[in-house]
Amino acid sequence: MAKSNKRRPAPEKPVKTRKCVFCSKKGQDIDYKDTALLRTYISERGKIRARRVTGNCVQHQRDIAVAVKNAREVALLPFGSSTR
């Protein structure tokens, strides 16, 4: 008796779309000196979170990435995690 190779299709999960925080709040700027804001977009391992995770639009995700990299250069943010 051979097993059937037919697989059931996975149930579809509803896709939850997020709104960009910076597009909804027009007055909020992305600055490399605002480390409290930038830390929310960095993982515990020190990596910049992806756009699909944060829900930002393309332009604001680029601005966050540039600001994080600038903050790392001037030693406001660490390059990696402090624990190994």
Curated annotation (Swiss-Prot):
HAMAP family: Ribosomal_bS18. Binds as a heterodimer with protein bS6 to the central domain of the 16S rRNA, where it helps stabilize the platform of the 30S subunit. NCBIfam families: S18. Belongs to the bacterial ribosomal protein bS18 family. GO terms for cellular component: cytosolic small ribosomal subunit. This is Small ribosomal subunit protein bS18. Part of the 30S ribosomal subunit. Forms a tight heterodimer with protein bS6. The gene is rpsR. It comes from the Bacteria. InterPro entries: Ribosomal_bS18, Ribosomal_bS18_CS, Ribosomal_bS18_sf. One of its GO terms (biological process) is translation. The keyword Magnesium does not apply. One of its GO terms (molecular function) is small ribosomal subunit rRNA binding. Keywords: Ribonucleoprotein, Ribosomal protein, RNA-binding, rRNA-binding.
